[in-house]
């Protein structure tokens, strides 16, 4: 496998890249991650089964688009490829540490707000379906935000759970609840990172960086809400964000709806206590 990866990387770089060092990196529940080195240039490699190729291809598409915005800093994609049994993505390697200092947290908040201001899009969705972790994320374009989120985010995850034999609520009834709660909220579509928890953000010598996106055009509050779901972001991050784009009234109610999507995805991926958390959140939303 590594010989094939080395050869494909050499073909891309137009010079022979001979791997002399390979270090397994911690983190990541889905793919194996490595740092490779030829003595001069290091790269970051994610590896999975061959069937994972499409997931790496759409991840690369999101990273390319985020780099195009010149707002938040993301790794550069070097190569997406496959071997006989595996698929892989190669990114430029940058040493990182936790993003936990006030100055850089404030800066990242500003950069995220600038991302949310970037571009013009009249509908919600994305040109391709992509993945939230290893879960397919449908992105069919829709003009109404309440319809898009209720059906392609909440309804989709609930249906996946139902196919696994888990029913937390009547799906059609709850989709209607979400539509009604979001009906009077008409945000402008913003390009989202889509999976913005603290494990996908770090600090490099060049400033804050984020990775593992699940991009789509949606309500910017979805990114902010997820930063609060699992915590780990400094107060200065939110101050930096709101110095560019203040949050709108009603955000704290909508936050529960938006984060339910990620809780349900964790139910589908991991089960366990996330099922109880999802049920409690559903009950809370119904009570609004």
UniProtKB/Swiss-Prot annotation:
Enzyme class: transferase
Source organism superkingdom: Bacteria
Enzyme Commission number(s) from the entry: 2.7.1.-
Location of the active site: 195 (proton acceptor)
UniProt keywords, alphabetically: ATP-binding, Kinase, Nucleotide-binding, Transferase
Binding site for ATP: 92-94
Molecular function GO labels: ATP binding; kinase activity
Disulfide bonds listed in the record: none
UniProt function note: Ketoamine kinase that phosphorylates ketoamines on the third carbon of the sugar moiety to generate ketoamine 3-phosphate.
Family: Belongs to the fructosamine kinase family.
Protein name: Probable ketoamine kinase VP1481
């Amino acid at each position: 496998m590594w010989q094939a990866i080395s050869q494909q990387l050499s073909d891309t770089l137009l010079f022979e890249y001979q791997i002399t060092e390979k270090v397994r990196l911690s983190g990541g529940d889905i793919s194996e991650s490595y740092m490779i080195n030829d003595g001069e240039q290091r790269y970051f490699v994610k590896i999975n089964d061959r069937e994972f190729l499409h997931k790496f291809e759409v991840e690369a598409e999101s990273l390319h688009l985020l780099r195009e915005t010149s707002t938040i800093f993301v790794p550069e994609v070097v190569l997406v490829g496959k071997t006989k049994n595996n698929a892989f993505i190669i990114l430029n390697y940058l040493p990182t540490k936790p993003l936990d200092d006030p100055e850089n947290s404030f800066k990242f908040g500003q950069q995220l707000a600038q991302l949310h201001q970037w571009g013009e899009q009249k509908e919600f969705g994305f040109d391709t379906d992509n993945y939230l972790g290893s879960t397919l994320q449908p992105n069919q374009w829709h003009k109404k935000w309440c319809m898009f989120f209720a059906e392609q985010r909440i309804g989709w995850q609930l249906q996946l759970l139902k196919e696994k034999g888990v029913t937390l609520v009547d799906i059609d009834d709850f989709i209607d609840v979400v539509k009604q709660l979001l009906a009077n909220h008409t945000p402008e579509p913003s390009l989202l990172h889509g999976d913005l928890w603290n494990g996908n953000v770090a600090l490099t010598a060049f400033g804050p960086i984020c990775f593992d996106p699940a991009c789509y055009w949606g309500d910017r509050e979805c990114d902010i809400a997820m930063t609060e779901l699992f915590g780990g972001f400094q107060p200065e991050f939110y101050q930096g964000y709101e110095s560019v784009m203040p949050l709108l009234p009603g955000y704290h109610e909508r936050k529960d709806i938006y984060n339910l999507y990620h809780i349900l995805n964790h139910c589908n991926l991991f089960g366990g206590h996330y099922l109880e958390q999802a049920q409690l959140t559903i009950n809370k939303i119904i009570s609004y």
